[in-house]
UniProtKB/Swiss-Prot annotation:
It is a peripheral membrane protein. Catalyzes the formation of phosphatidylethanolamine (PtdEtn) from phosphatidylserine (PtdSer). GO terms for biological process: phosphatidylethanolamine biosynthetic process. Residues 292-322 are annotated as: Disordered. It comes from Escherichia coli O7:K1 (strain IAI39 / ExPEC). Its cofactor is pyruvate. This is Phosphatidylserine decarboxylase proenzyme. Heterodimer of a large membrane-associated beta subunit and a small pyruvoyl-containing alpha subunit. Its main location: membrane. GO terms for cellular component: plasma membrane.
Length: 322
């Protein structure tokens, strides 16, 4: 009965306005009130603040600052084996497995369309038919920055407007085509393991979705699909990210979907639905063997990442939109 009531609310409540209100409130500096809200949130969701770079809740000027708090480097070590892809987010695996032609498993008895997830982009969908997928759910208590499973060169980003259903286990089991209906940002990378898509899915009360190379992608919510492309390799203007490096973030919780090309990776055997994930832990293993490099490449300094994030050049210049 309670679950039926919760599902009914998903269709009745004004999700867009609730999301706008939450985003507005979370961005406000309210002094002692902000600290009180953060303290209550930490207590209710049992957030482990010892992992944060700033464990004192009084150090956060807004709720959003707290929500996207960076962690101490040593608490999420990255697996350095060049044959291993790592978890992109802290959370719980909702579903994982093989993409059956155009079908991706959402929950038991529920599939959705790969092509619909990719906003009808059949050329991109062709890269992943019969490939592998992993869906990771980020709960409110989790760290909400998203990282790279492997080295990658960004080739394309697509913003897809949509609904703002919650993306928890209840809605995944009961709302048809959930991830292909919700607002999302699709990021396509060239990697050593073939093409990889990392998709950031919005939800109710997700105030914004951001990337380190373009800043805030949504809001504004203009109701139109937007597309950006980048050059390959070392060409001017290319965007290269390293394994374990931050690539985006949510302001309030949501879901990350990873798509891998067929025959390129095998998921780690012990992973299953509801497995807990931590950034940097093994996610998949290459079907080919790579030689360990003599030296690991150095990631971009944190301050450079923040500078790129704050600049938001692509949000201001939308000449490549379609």
């Amino acid at each position: 009965m309670l679950n039926s009531f919760k599902l009914s609310l998903q269709y009745i409540l004004p999700k867009l306005w609730l999301t706008r209100l939450a985003g507005w409130g979370a961005s406000k500096r309210a002094g002692w009130l902000t600290k009180l809200v953060i303290d209550l949130f930490v207590k209710y969701y049992k957030v482990d603040m010892k992992e944060a770079q700033k464990p004192d809740t009084a150090s956060y000027r807004t709720f959003n600052e707290f929500f996207v708090r960076p962690l101490r480097d040593e608490v999420r070590p990255i697996d350095t084996d060049p044959n291993v892809l790592v978890m992109p987010a802290d959370g719980v695996i909702s579903q994982l497995g093989k993409i059956e032609e155009d079908k991706i498993l959402q929950a038991k008895g529920h599939n959705y369309s790969l092509e619909a997830l990719l906003a009808g982009n059949y050329l991109m969908a062709d890269l992943f038919r019969n490939g592998t997928f992993v869906t990771t759910y980020l709960s409110p208590r989790d760290y909400h920055r998203v990282h790279m499973p492997c080295n990658g060169i960004l080739r394309e980003m697509i913003y897809v407007p949509g609904d703002l259903f919650s993306v928890n286990h209840l809605t995944a089991q009961n709302v048809p085509n959930l991830f292909a209906r919700n607002e999302r940002v699709i990021c396509l990378f060239d990697t050593e393991f073939g093409p990889m898509a990392q998709i950031l899915v919005g939800a109710t009360i997700v105030g914004s979705i951001e990337t380190v190379w373009a800043g805030t992608i949504t809001p504004p919510r203009e109701g139109i699909i937007k597309r950006w492309t980048w050059p390959a390799g070392e060409n001017d203007g290319s965007v290269a990210l390293l394994k374990g490096q931050e690539m985006g973030r949510f302001k309030l919780g949501s879901t990350v979907i990873n798509l891998f090309a067929p025959g390129k990776v095998n998921l780690v055997e012990q992973l299953e639905s509801l497995s807990v994930t931590k950034i940097g832990q093994p996610l998949a293993v290459s079907t080919e063997t790579f030689v360990t490099p003599d030296a690991e490449p150095s990631p971009l300094p944190a301050e450079e990442i923040e500078a790129e994030h704050d600049a938001s050049p692509l949000v201001d210049d939308k000449k490549d939109q379609v």
